[in-house]
Amino acid sequence: MQEIFLCSISNVRSGDCKEDCAYCTQSSHHQGAIKRYKFKDEKVVLQEARALRELGALGFCLVTSGRELDDEKCEYIAKLAKAINKEELGLHLIACCGRADLEQLEFLRDAGIHSYNHNLETSQNFFPKICSTHTWEERFITCENALRAGLGLCSGGIFGLNESWEDRIEMLRALASLSPHTTPINFFIKNPVLPIDAETLSADEALECVLLAKEFLPNARLMVAGGREVVFKDNDKKEAKLFEYGINAVVLGDYLTTKGKAPKKDIEKLLSYGLTMATSCH
């Protein structure tokens, strides 16, 4: 039976981002109807960590909105990491806090963070069409910094932004040069507050994207993330093919500003596909 890994997300700082990423409702350039808060209370984060670990999650990603890490965010994430690790839950902790330099990432590593997530999102060529406030190159350098700091690298992208297949190949080729431990695969879902006007990918095209990712990243843990519940809806037969085509990790529960599948029902469905849940992160 195929073993899959469950990962969960905690949006520990939400909204009011000054970047203009066209795919993100957390940008202050878009009037998204989302919750906005500076820092989530530590007790709430610990409750989330315990609950999700009990459901079987092995990865727990602490995500902050905004362009980059700063001293305040570093201290906050470090404090959360130490508190979660003190619980001895056996969680693999990931931080996702935007652009970061080597010193900042080493600080997080020493505080108990195991991996850093920073997605390339799309190809270097297509990126200026979806963001003007920072460059693709900045993203790539942050990924390199994570590796230099001795952190596991989690880096992937979004399919369905109106990019071409050539753009998809270019992104995957760049990711392959980084050899990430985990690659999140997201499918863009149109939102009326966002400037990207793109139709939701069909399940068949999404599966083709997964096959392509597996070809370029045969050794990475491919994790299906945002958009799965919309692209595959109730099409169990095609959703099951995700795992035949190379997916071996799943985001369990909600995303940053959108609802995911109900965790218990999602796990039941995954088990019905003949999958088993990993019990340790390796």
Swiss-Prot record:
User: Could you tell me which Gene3D superfamilies the record lists for this protein?
Assistant: Aldolase class I
Q: Which cofactor does it need?
A: [4Fe-4S] cluster; [2Fe-2S] cluster
UniProt remark on cofactor binding: Binds 1 [4Fe-4S] cluster. The cluster is coordinated with 3 cysteines and an exchangeable S-adenosyl-L-methionine. Binds 1 [2Fe-2S] cluster. The cluster is coordinated with 3 cysteines and 1 arginine.
Give me the residues that bind [4Fe-4S] cluster, please: C17, C21, C24
Q: Which UniProt keywords apply?
A: 2Fe-2S, 4Fe-4S, Biotin biosynthesis, Iron, Iron-sulfur, Metal-binding, S-adenosyl-L-methionine, Transferase
Q: What does this protein do?
A: Catalyzes the conversion of dethiobiotin (DTB) to biotin by the insertion of a sulfur atom into dethiobiotin via a radical-based mechanism.
PANTHER family documented for this protein: BIOTIN SYNTHASE, BIOTIN SYNTHASE, MITOCHONDRIAL
Family to which this protein belongs: Belongs to the radical SAM superfamily. Biotin synthase family.
Q: What is this protein called?
A: Biotin synthase
